[in-house]
Structure formats: structure tokens, C-alpha cells
């Protein structure tokens, strides 16, 4: 499971997810990618489930890059506890994803295999996604 080795503070504010992604909006390493179309928190468990779905479909061939990292802790209070008496204990880790962010990249497999692998991964994520392909001039083409 992905998580930071150490953090300065155990608890963080929730923050706002306004606007589009500033960086990581183009395919950098692979040939095909999965791009977020909405803002969301993605947990380390969801990232791992998507990674497993992709690698299983590709029969462990090709290469997968995970371009998001769950660096934000989220907290939760126990069940049936009254309001107040402080913030809850850290429950898990999330990656903040904004629209336009490339979350996963794949190389070394055919387009049909990559498209199906990324479709399976998209079903594991709580955000609407689209398949993108690297163009010859360095950018990506927005195919659906």
C-alpha cells in the first residue's frame, strides 16, 4: 500500500479541490494513460486495486507508472461517538486528484490491451476518467 514514510503533522485540513490540475496533465513516460475528468480523493487502497486490475489484464507484461501518490492523511471518529472532543484519529491516506491529471500510464502493450486494462482500472476509481494516447509530437490525443 502506498503511504508516506514520515510526515511533519499527523492530521491535515481537508482543503478545497478547485480548478484544474497544474502539472501532470500530459503523458510523460508511457504510451497510453488514464486521465481524470473530475476532482476527487483517491485512497491508497483504490490505487492498489486499480494497479492490480491493470497488471493482471496485461498478464504482467508491459510497464505501469502510477503518477499519483496518497500523501494526505484523512481522519475518522469511531462509530457512535458524540460530536466534539477533538479531531478523529488518522484513518488512511488519499491522493488529491483534479481534472486533467494523468493518474496511470502504460507502455509495452498493444492499444487494445492498454485500453481494456485502463478501463478495468477506471472501474476501481471514484472519479470519471478517459483513455488518452501519446501523440508523436510529444503531447497526447484525447480519444474516448
Swiss-Prot record:
One of its GO terms (molecular function) is structural constituent of ribosome. InterPro entries: Ribosomal_uL16, Ribosomal_uL16_bact-type, Ribosomal_uL16_CS, Ribosomal_uL16_dom, Ribosomal_uL16_sf. GO terms for cellular component: cytosolic large ribosomal subunit. One of its GO terms (biological process) is translation. Keywords: Ribonucleoprotein, Ribosomal protein, RNA-binding, rRNA-binding, tRNA-binding. Gene3D superfamilies: Ribosomal protein L10e/L16 (3.90.1170.10). The keyword Ribonucleoprotein applies. HAMAP family: Ribosomal_uL16. Part of the 50S ribosomal subunit. Binds 23S rRNA and is also seen to make contacts with the A and possibly P site tRNAs. Belongs to the universal ribosomal protein uL16 family. This is Large ribosomal subunit protein uL16. It comes from Bacillus mycoides (strain KBAB4). The lineage of its organism: Bacteria, Bacillati, Bacillota, Bacilli, Bacillales. The gene is rplP.
